[in-house]
UniProtKB/Swiss-Prot annotation:
Subcellular location(s) per record: Cell membrane
Residues bearing a lipid moiety (S-diacylglycerol cysteine): 22
Cleavable signal peptide: 1-21
Protein name, UniProt field: Probable lipoprotein CPn_0875/CP_0994/CPj0875/CpB0904
Lipid tethering residues (N-palmitoyl cysteine): 22
Amino acid sequence: MKRVIYKTIFCGLTLLTSLSSCSLDPKGYNLETKNSRDLNQESVILKENRETPSLVKRLSRRSRRLFARRDQTQKDTLQVQANFKTYAEKISEQDERDLSFVVSSAAEKSSISLALSQGEIKDALYRIREVHPLALIEALAENPALIEGMKKMQGRDWIWNLFLTQLSEVFSQAWSQGVISEEDIAAFASTLGLDSGTVASIVQGERWPELVDIVIT
């Protein structure tokens, strides 16, 4: 009788154990039940993960196109032809005042003063940027005060380098537009007592800093 009772109890415990095991995974951890909301969220996350690389690629291509357009716009701006004066026109009194103002400012003013005066300096530079390159250099060479100012600028590296860079860009544009002729070079060299062959070589090679050096030394 006792054996039957023990057997019945054992079978019952076995049944309860088997039922409870249905809520456990093989490793003994509780399985989490997921509702439809959780499943939908996981679906969205997986979809986003799949779409993210393609989105990044699209944005990258769009950025490259944007910067390419900007770069082309900048190039187009640089290629716009300037209305340079001829060498025979020389420079006007206003041009001389503007040139003196730019040189004296760059030679004498402190960095703070230059920053405060940058609007006036830019206006003066804009007005003289279309002066014929050789006429501009000739005006520098024939004015002792300007030569002295240029020498002071040489002692201020960043200002001098900036000046030469800007001057070279404008002069190279003039050369590319055919503004500087062989006759201009010959007349310029004759006026300043320079060798025309040397000047021609410098101009044709667009070695503008060298041209500045030979007229202020």
